[in-house]
Amino acid sequence: MAHATPQGVKLLNGWKRPGRFDKGLGAQLPEAYRKFWREWKLTTPAAVHYIPKEQQWERDEVTHAIKPVQNIPLPLIDTPESHRGIWGGEAVIKGFQKREQTKRRVPHFWVPNLRRSVVHSHVLDCYMSVVVTERTLEQIHECHGFDHYLLKNRACDLRSALALKLKREVLQALQNGVPALADEPERQQEVLKEYRRYLEPYTPEEIDWYGHTYLEAIRKLQKQLREAEKVVPHKLEFRGKLIEQLRQAGISEAGKLEKPDALAAESSVEHKDSDIEALTKLESSPSSSWLSKINPFGKKET
């Protein structure tokens, strides 16, 4: 079969479409970020907008026919506003609604009920005013605190970029020993004892890359690459080479000749004579032919 295809063995299992991690800067992203991305985008979240059925078969109420159960999640729309709040896994649903029996169905958007509330983080030691839903408040109460809610739930269940950013900050604070409570050692130890167990599934690199969007991860990678490969301007490079050649020839730099007025008056003549002699020796050497062209004291070739 492989000889029948022009590409050989490569197309036996079909053509794989390149993804965001297969080309460009996305291919250079570390495995720590890819693990977070799989948890955020490729993991099936908990059912929020429908009740999943546990049985494999069910009987139709009208036709009484037996049919298999298909727990297909609803397609959700993550709006920019959803990433600026904490919606508890909820999102906007687009569908159709038949409002009257004798009229056609019309498009409709179902939006969760939003409200602004204040949440408190023990690890960060701060209060935050965020837009939440009733489900978010219920889950915070079930988890016995906002920090537990962030650390217990996976990225696919938190869903919003704000919640993931706060979770990364909480993990980094726990990793650094809760610096926000440095003035209260007893309370600091209590918080560390209560939340330290959430650090076990993560490595320091995974915590550093956790909660970033794809664009933020690319910008962070570009910043690391620029810092690792700093380009030295040619001006500084050539200046360093010139100073090194002058130093080998015995000529001191102009900045180092600056002395007090009393000493400068005595040694000015000596420095001029020594510099002229050194430049003359430097001109005679074959490696300094280019320097003789810019030396105003050098002899002109006839």
Swiss-Prot record:
GO biological-process terms attached to the record: mitochondrial translation
Keyword annotations: Mitochondrion, Ribonucleoprotein, Ribosomal protein, Transit peptide
GO CC term (a single one): mitochondrial large ribosomal subunit
* GO MF terms held by the record: structural constituent of ribosome
List, alphabetically, the SUPFAM superfamilies matched: L28p-like (SSF143800)
Keyword Ribosomal protein tagged:
yes
- Name where it's found: Mitochondrion
Q: Which InterPro entries match?
A: Ribosomal_bL28 (IPR026569), Ribosomal_bL28/bL31-like_sf (IPR034704)
Q: Assembly and partners? A: Component of the mitochondrial ribosome large subunit (39S) which comprises a 16S rRNA and about 50 distinct proteins.
The UniProt entry's sequence similarity note says:
Belongs to the bacterial ribosomal protein bL28 family.
Q: What is this protein called?
A: Large ribosomal subunit protein bL28m
Upper taxonomic lineage: Eukaryota, Metazoa, Ecdysozoa, Arthropoda, Hexapoda
